[in-house]
Amino acid sequence: MFHIPVMPLETSRYLIGKPGGLYVDCTFGGGGHALYLLDKFKDIKIVAFDWDEDSSKRFIEREKEFSGRVTFIRDNFKNVKKALSALNISKVDGILADIGVSSKQFGDLDRGFSFNSGTLDMRMDKRNGFEAKEVVNSYSYEDLADIFYKYGEERKSRQIASAILLRRKRGIINTASELQTVICSVKRPEGRINPATKVFQALRIFVNSELENLAVLLSDAPELLNAGGRTVIISFHSLEDRIVKQNFKRNSECGIYKILTKKVVTALKEEVKINPGSRSARIRAAEKTSV
């Protein structure tokens, strides 16, 4: 089953600027946005990217439903420029990236994204990189504290790093639940928010180089767009949104972009009731003004 896309109407309104055209879905995921766009705009085609193996499998299973209008590439969206070149595509009419972890990824206990996972992996692409388990069990106090603060904006980053090093003296921290226990020994719950939320976010972002990948995509996007083409980014926390906002502002000041969203666009209350995952979603969009 394909996931429920976040703010599909708003996304399509900002992404599709003219009839027809070729678009890039940088984060295919469960195919929700792609299917919505293909159904709403019968004359567009999409090049879809995702580095998650599960996403690749879902596309293959239901490829016929896309009627030959989607080309799927299993790769990190930081490589969009190179991948499009390999397909002899020099320009596209829009670029969409939904920078979030899906409910399916959170629900898969073998992935390590949730607090109850039986593993501390957290890699989006298991072919590459290192697991969060390696970070937690081998990084220094200073490095752990910096990661938790930089990527999770965790105010108790140093206390948590100290608690992790103390726990490591008793043995390896193998599971997400074990790590959560360590964090909860330092930090108390704040309302409904799990005390481990920011540390888990920080580890996931660090392991997958999420902010660096986003920066590369944003840097390459103007060169890949036709005049009038649009970049639409859906982010879920302030770190990502800040990078997008600053990039759009710089390109706007240089005359490369016209910003379409003067303020971030958020989900309506009605959508949040149906899809709680949309609560923290924020859309920013910009249109290329120069060739």
Curated annotation (Swiss-Prot):
Its EC number is 2.1.1.199. S-adenosyl-L-methionine binds at residues 31-33, 50, 77, 98, 105. It is an enzyme of class 2 (transferase). GO terms for molecular function: rRNA (cytosine-N4-)-methyltransferase activity. It catalyses: cytidine(1402) in 16S rRNA + S-adenosyl-L-methionine = N(4)-methylcytidine(1402) in 16S rRNA + S-adenosyl-L-homocysteine + H(+). Coiled coil: none annotated. It holds the Pfam family Methyltransf_5. It is found in: Cytoplasm. Keywords: Cytoplasm, Methyltransferase, rRNA processing, S-adenosyl-L-methionine, Transferase. Its main location: cytoplasm. GO terms for biological process: rRNA base methylation. GO terms for cellular component: cytoplasm. Belongs to the methyltransferase superfamily. RsmH family. Specifically methylates the N4 position of cytidine in position 1402 (C1402) of 16S rRNA. HAMAP family: 16SrRNA_methyltr_H. This is Ribosomal RNA small subunit methyltransferase H. It comes from Endomicrobium trichonymphae.
